[in-house]
Curated annotation (Swiss-Prot):
CDD domains per the UniProt record, alphabetical: AdoMet_MTases (cd02440)
TRAM domain ranges (all copies): 10-69
Residue sites binding [4Fe-4S] cluster per the record: 82, 88, 91, 169
Name used for this protein in its record: 23S rRNA (uracil(1939)-C(5))-methyltransferase RlmD
Organism: Aliivibrio salmonicida (strain LFI1238)
Any Pfam family: TRAM
Family in the record: Belongs to the class I-like SAM-binding methyltransferase superfamily. RNA M5U methyltransferase family. RlmD subfamily.
Enzyme class: transferase
Alphabetized InterPro entries for the sequence: 23S_rRNA_MeTrfase_RlmD, MeTrfase_TrmA_AS, MeTrfase_TrmA_CS, NA-bd_OB-fold, SAM-dependent_MTases_sf, TRAM_dom, U5_MeTrfase_fam
Gene: rlmD
Known function: Catalyzes the formation of 5-methyl-uridine at position 1939 (m5U1939) in 23S rRNA.
């Protein structure tokens, strides 16, 4: 007998307005209240506030709600610095005073470590810099608006594919922010504006970089308009006609300097978004490693050599491991350009066993790792097996740092120092650093 598929009925959501007391922030900086002992996550609400909410999602274990209005405001609330804050998906903590953001993030880091059973340790002072004008990179979305026949130019709305039109962003470095208005005007004047994908702006130490993704070739007039714009403003121009093709059209090769080392990059490469915090982060990592001239250091997830190259100036040998082949080539080139012959880079998938790798038999005295948000679960057993004296773990996700810390501690290491770096002010994200010693 044939059976017909019957889709489950979509669970209905109680849309009545409800008054709640917000008790704390979650790990993504949404306010948490409790209704019938079940947590309700409320974007934009702060602890000690009373709020009128409306459910937008109700699950068995939790609910999500929209903030309708506040009947009692926290003394720690402030007016957002950006006119687009309520709509733009970039920042989600501008309504909380910056000093309180630091406290909340520090608490989040400590709580996650404690939840994983990691014992308390020496907590370093948070590393801070400017809370505004800090982002040296921005990806600007472009969509053709059929009603206006103009490009929508800006950032994605919160939980949406729609675009918030932006001409000024207070968290962008001023060198990039100053170009938003004129860039919007230029792109809308191009004949081929319908064929634009997105735009990226990156601030290098030797100038501002403009990357334009386009899906059809520019005509001669459009090419000249782009070139004239960049010449007039001394911008470095890259065009990307395909996702894996990058053409350097105008200007110098971009680089940034850290600890007197020049690190060259392309606008497709990952670099830390906050230059000032990155400088402090590298300096702190090198200090925590307590380096000497005889050390042999392994740098995992090394990228372009952000840590490897400064390390090479202070120790006997550095080996950098990176999963992306193009990044490895660029790191090797950076070492050569900086005349550092005691650092070697290899490409390897760090989620796979590395016993057969040529570098795995080296006796490393110290290890540094700086993985992506997914963490380094696949490599932690290897780190422990190599038995370094010291491990410094740099993390952009405290949840995976807490998880991975357990693996080292189980193998005889002790967490001796932990610190937060305010890499992403006005967002729920945080950078952290942990020191493990045998």
């Amino acid at each position: 007998m044939a059976q017909f598929f019957k889709p489950k009925k979509k669970a209905s959501v109680n849309t009545k307005h409800l008054s709640v007391d917000v008790v704390r922030l979650d790990h993504n900086s949404a306010g948490i209240a409790f209704v019938d002992k079940k947590p309700v996550f409320i974007e934009g609400a702060l602890p000690e506030e009373q709020a009128i909410i409306q459910f937008i999602e109700q699950k068995k274990q939790y609910s999500r709600a929209k903030l309708i209005k506040l009947t009692k405001k926290s003394s720690k609330r402030q007016a957002p610095i950006c006119q687009h804050y309520d709509d733009c998906g970039g920042c989600n903590l501008q309504h909380l005073q910056h000093a309180e953001q630091i406290i909340a993030k520090n608490d989040k880091l400590q709580e996650l470590m404690k939840k994983q059973g990691v014992d308390a340790c020496d907590v370093a002072e948070p590393i801070l810099a400017n809370e505004h004008d800090y982002r040296r990179r921005a990806r600007i979305s472009l969509i053709m608006n059929k009603q206006t026949n103009q490009l929508d130019f800006g950032f994605r709305k919160k939980q949406s594919k729609e675009i918030v039109n932006v001409r000024h962003c207070p968290v962008l470095v001023k060198e990039l922010d100053q170009h938003l208005e004129s860039l919007y005007t230029l792109l809308n004047q191009l004949k081929g504006k319908r064929h634009l994908g997105h735009v990226e702006l990156v601030q290098a130490d030797n100038g501002s970089v403009l990357l334009i993704r386009h899906v059809a070739a520019f005509n001669e007039k459009d090419q000249q308009a782009l070139l004239h714009y960049c010449e007039e403003r001394d911008l470095i121009l890259y065009l990307m006609p395909e996702s894996d093709v990058l053409n350097h059209v105008y200007g110098e090769e971009p680089y940034y300097v850290i600890d007197e080392v020049k690190i060259y990059f392309t606008p497709k490469d990952f670099i830390q978004v906050n230059a000032s915090i990155n400088d402090s982060m590298v300096n702190q990592a090198l200090t925590w490693l307590d380096l000497n001239a005889d050390d042999c250091v392994l740098d995992l997830f090394c990228g372009l050599g952000n840590f490897s190259l400064p390390l090479a100036q202070k120790v006997k040998t550095v080996v950098g491991i990176e999963g992306v082949e193009e990044m490895v080539k660029r790191a090797q080139s950076n070492a050569k350009r900086n005349e550092l012959d005691n650092v070697t880079f290899y490409q390897a998938n760090l989620e796979e066993p590395i016993d057969q790798q040529v570098w795995a038999s080296t006796k490393f005295t110290k290890i540094l790792l700086d993985p992506a948000r997914a963490g380094a679960a696949g490599v932690m057993q290897t780190v422990a097996k190599l038995k370094p004296e010291t491990v410094v773990y740099v993390s952009c996700n405290p949840a995976t740092l807490a998880r991975d810390s357990q693996l080292l501690i189980q193998r005889g290491y002790k967490l001796t120092r932990l610190g937060m770096l305010d890499m992403f002010p006005h967002t729920g994200h945080l950078e952290s650093m942990a020191l493990f010693e045998r």
